């Protein structure tokens, strides 16, 4: 294989795993760090932290691969996804399957260094990562499944650090699901016209003209759940300031999606990286 061909193939694999678009990894990373710091009431054990950070990137990459495999016959009809490696033929279906298996094996190898409770919970993480891409064909609520998939590192984090799943763990998971449905609805608003044309379901379609209101309510629920978590964990004032800052970011996002235009809706989605970061900094400073 010529050097230029190898380079082209490598670039295609990177695009398939979204290495060039880290936003998904970051949106998966922040809830993971929330959980690890809350479960350990401060900085978690270095080994656990490394395992989860690497796991975030491996599992996000695996999720992108299976998502593109599930959508390989419809991505060519959507403007934003038509040039992806599978619909464009740069990567074959067999190659994508092999890559998915490799990424899952790497992830599971990491989990095997943790306790048995975390290992068992990881099986649910695999199931959620696999079924999510197919949910948009059977329900208008695939974003709820995505929220569970993106948030499953939360119970895994608590299990790894404390070998327990307290109330705070489940409240944090619920907050993350609300947040994920909100930001992924913003993302789905970008593709709403294409999705309606090809018959793909999403919360953006389900919510219709009430989309902005429901996104706002989900964002409010996220903030209120975070307040409850702060109270239960006796977090300091820095955490509550971070909640206020997150609320300001949500308000800014509402302004961006006001006209339901593609580019501003996508920018609103990207802005959620700062929400996750701000909330993590609030937790971090509280345990300083």
UniProtKB/Swiss-Prot annotation:
GO MF terms held by the record: 4-hydroxybenzoate polyprenyltransferase activity
Keyword Magnesium attributed: yes
Gene3D superfamilies the record matches: UbiA prenyltransferase
Domain of life from the UniProt record: Bacteria
Location in or out of the cell: Cell inner membrane
Cofactors: Mg(2+)
Family the UniProt entry places it in: Belongs to the UbiA prenyltransferase family.
HAMAP family: UbiA
Protein's recorded name: 4-hydroxybenzoate octaprenyltransferase
Biological source species: Yersinia pestis
Gene: ubiA
